[in-house]
Amino acid sequence: MKYKKTMGCILGGLLLSAFLYWQDNGLMLTRMNYEGDIPKAFQGYKILQVSDLQNKVFGKKQKPLLKKIKESAPDMIVITGDLLDRHEGRTNVDSAMELIQEIMGIAPVYFVSGNHEHQSGEWDVLLDKLIDAGVTVLDNGKSIIEKDGDTITLIGLADKSVNPYYHEMLHTLMAGQEERFNILLSHRPELFDTYVEENIDLVFTGHAHGGQIIIPFLRQGVFAPHQGFFPKYTEGMHEKDGTVMVVSRGLGNSSFPFRIFNRPELIEVTLSAK
């Protein structure tokens, strides 16, 4: 009897370990479709979102992650912050750049910072390396994307932790862009009402880590930074007054070491005209 109990505990421990490993490492490519007033040339245009890697490594030289990105075959790759992890002993700029150097050959890459970049003490180092690699860093900036004579505006906000006047900054960046289809990259989903107020068409965000633990069947996250317990914006698409916000569950972990019913994800959004 004692032997059976011991073996049962061992088996249970192994199954739990396997489950937690799969939850943390079982990469997903989540495909979404956005319908809106898309310029004709951008019909079918694919945007691949990478968020909240937090210095996590998926196999040797990020091969499983790269395989998923290549599978998407995107027209554009957007990174919405927290490529680095701020915690002592985990911040590794060179490791983060390993992924960047590989994806530069897949599609143009656009980046905005998250709170971890600025809290790591390595932001200036990472910024220089991103620019040297050919990444377009859009912290409080914008870029006009042209395709076959049509254009869209891509806007980026630096993280709120170093950008306290983010609303005023976004208002300034949007000036003169009202008639052009616009996309915003921002780390923070909890600022959704600000994005709505500025009439952004499509927003890509992260930061919430999917609520870390998702309650099955309810699809309710338990906790997200700057939203607290049972947060509203942790994953998926959210729409309000014509603004659509995409929230990535992200790829890595930080303060809390596990994901439960919340596998790491890349997001692919295909643009479609109504």
Predicted regions and their residues:
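Extended recognition/assembly regions associated with phosphoester-bond processing machinery
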Residues: 30-36, 173-185, 244, 251, ...
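Active-site metal-binding loops of divalent metal-dependent hydrolases
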Residues: 50-55, 81-83, 115-117, 141-142, ...
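Conserved beta-sheet core of the metallophosphoesterase superfamily
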Residues: 189-267
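Beta-strand-turn-beta hairpins that frame and shape the catalytic cleft
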Residues: 35-48, 135, 143-155, 177-180, ...
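Membrane-embedded segments
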Residues: 45-138
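Binuclear metal-dependent hydrolase catalytic cores centered on His/Asp/Glu-rich metal-binding motifs
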Residues: 121, 128, 132-135, 147-186, ...
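N-terminal membrane-anchoring alpha-helices
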Residues: 1-41
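Conserved acidic residues
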Residues: 75-77, 82, 180-183, 201
